[in-house]
């Protein structure tokens, strides 16, 4: 029985692995389904001819949803617009959500030089909270309150030495549990990181980035394209209820099944979204080739799908055309209905409305040319 009390720092947080069975028949059955869905996602990503299409779009959607879980609310449109604008013109919520994307990429790059570890978590949290410097908590006073009641529902461990010790155990569990499926490791490690709550802010977002990095490190994905925060947003009450269920009753099975179902649901959703983007890419390519043959190149079509908003400078940077010619190309693409010109402040942007429609919505249909 847990000796946990909501108002007392949980310095007795049990280490990993749990004493409870986390490989029950039910868990393993759900794990097989989630692994199959992830394998389909990995294959779908490999079949996209230009990986930038995924790496520039799906992490932005994950950044928006993961930030929304923490009540940092912006829109998909604003995020993609802001990628093409000066940072000083971004509103605070959009800027913080984009920092999540920056942190995700920084974590992804770090896997080439060191395994997932406490230092990775510190680096990721610092990128999320920039310009504030984040370090392992040294003082007490951190407590999590219920959204409606305002009552304290959980007080994480206190003391830097205690927290670092629990993170060291978390790290060992990730790397020394080879007999466990990586998805079960991810689910258990995610609970533990949330329970340790090592920083004064940014813990939830850091933990969700670490999920993606763990899947890449274990070889289940090649790119950080799992949009798991979408599932958590849709099932947010269950997310917090099941986290607390592990703390109160050591109910690991319900929590792990929730995460496995989320991985399967999200991977299947993303495969369908990738398929829709591929169909739109082919339609766009054919439409430009038919109605603007003089400017058609494969490089130009690729660029239009790397982000839903394009500007003249993007064509210049890609070596497709000089400024005056690039302006002519974008005007012609607007004339044939591929792009739509908009002006935001001093910025002239060209939106691919059909691509934006796909990225903004749940559905996978789009208006044909």
From Swiss-Prot:
UniProt xrefs under Gene3D superfamilies: Fido-like domain
Any one Pfam family match given in the protein's UniProt record, by short name: Fic
Domain of life assignment: Bacteria
InterPro entries with a match to the protein in the record: Fic/DOC_N, Fido, Fido-like_dom_sf, Fido_containing, SoFic-like, SoFic-like_C
Signal peptide: none
Domain Fido: start-end pairs: 111-261
Miscellaneous section: Present in outer membrane vesicle formulations which are used as vaccines in human.
Listed name of the protein: Uncharacterized protein NMB0459
């Amino acid at each position: 029985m847990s000796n946990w009390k909501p108002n007392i720092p949980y310095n007795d947080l049990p280490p990993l692995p749990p004493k409870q069975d986390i490989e029950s028949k039910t868990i393993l059955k759900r794990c097989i389904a989630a692994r199959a869905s992830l394998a389909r996602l990995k294959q779908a990503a490999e079949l996209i001819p230009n990986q930038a299409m995924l790496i520039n779009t799906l992490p932005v959607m994950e950044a928006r949803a993961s930030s929304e879980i923490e009540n940092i609310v912006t829109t998909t449109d604003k995020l993609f617009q802001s990628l093409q604008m000066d940072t000083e013109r971004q509103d605070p919520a959009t800027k913080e959500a984009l920092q999540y994307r920056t942190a995700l990429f920084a974590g992804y790059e770090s896997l080439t030089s060191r395994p997932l570890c406490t230092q990775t978590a510190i680096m990721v949290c610092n990128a999320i909270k920039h310009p504030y410097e984040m370090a392992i908590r040294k003082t007490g006073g951190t407590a999590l309150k219920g959204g409606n009641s305002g009552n304290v529902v959980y007080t994480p461990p206190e003391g830097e030495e205690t927290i670092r010790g629990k993170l060291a155990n978390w790290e060992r569990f990730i790397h020394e549990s080879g007999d466990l499926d990586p998805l079960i490791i991810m689910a258990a490690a995610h609970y533990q990181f949330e329970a340790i709550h090592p920083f004064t802010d940014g813990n939830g977002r850091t933990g969700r980035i670490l999920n993606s990095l763990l899947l890449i490190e274990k070889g289940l994905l090649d790119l950080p394209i799992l949009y798991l925060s979408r599932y958590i947003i849709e099932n947010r009450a269950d997310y917090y209820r099941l986290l607390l269920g592990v703390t109160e009753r050591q109910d690991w099975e319900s929590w792990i099944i929730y995460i496995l179902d989320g991985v399967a649901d999200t991977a299947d959703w993303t495969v369908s979204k990738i398929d829709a983007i591929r169909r739109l890419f082919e339609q766009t390519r054919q439409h430009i080739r038919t109605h603007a043959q003089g400017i058609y190149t494969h490089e130009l079509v690729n660029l239009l799908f790397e982000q839903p908003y394009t500007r003249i400078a993007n064509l210049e940077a890609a070596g497709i055309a000089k400024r005056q010619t690039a302006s002519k190309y974008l005007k012609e693409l607007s004339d044939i209905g591929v792009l739509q010109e908009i002006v935001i402040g001093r910025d002239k942007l060209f939106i691919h409305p059909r691509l934006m429609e796909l990225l903004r919505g749940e559905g996978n249909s789009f208006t044909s040319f």
